[in-house]
Amino acid sequence: MNWRSKRIWIELITGSRKISNFCWAFILFLGSLGFLLVGISSYLGRNLISLFPPQQILFFPQGIVMSFYGIAGLFISSYLWCTISWNVGSGYDRFDRKEGIVCIFRWGFPGKNRRIFLRFLIKDIQSIRIELKEGIYTRRVLYLEIRGQGAIPLTRTDDNLTPREIEQKAAELAYFLRIPIEVF
């Protein structure tokens, strides 16, 4: 969702609460739980998963390996669920021509730097930079080039914007801020 007027442009950024992240976390949790249950079943010599017929899986080496994969998968799944619940990467970009200020806010991981807040003047912006890399791993990213601070990304690398969409967004933002565009 975006909000624009003549002097203020606010763009909300989606964080880690995407449908694909929910799907991956859920699939990974179920798969790793299955691996762990099969490993524990082989250790105990009982069938803990009643949906499947009992299979003879020796604890050494198959049961140990499956238990290890199950535990590792549960750790990765819990990491994904934590990033989803904390909504890491979400935030907003606010461009205020009236005040002459640009504010970029993102949520991070819990701790000292949970809130990432950047504020700078519009007159310090050199240009809007578009980075286009085509090939197997396409990369289309929009940056703000700031004097003394380098380039700050405005779009995520996994947004999968088409070249037309990224150019349109860059042109609208450059027109709104009255700054030039650079293409790399």
Curated annotation (Swiss-Prot):
It is found in: Plastid, Chloroplast thylakoid membrane. The chain crosses the membrane at residues 21-43, 58-80. Keywords: Chloroplast, Membrane, Photosynthesis, Plastid, Thylakoid, Transmembrane, Transmembrane helix. GO terms for biological process: photosynthesis. It is a multi-pass membrane protein. It holds the Pfam family Ycf4. GO terms for cellular component: chloroplast thylakoid membrane; photosystem I. Seems to be required for the assembly of the photosystem I complex. Belongs to the Ycf4 family. HAMAP family: Ycf4. This is Photosystem I assembly protein Ycf4. It comes from Carpobrotus chilensis. The gene is ycf4.
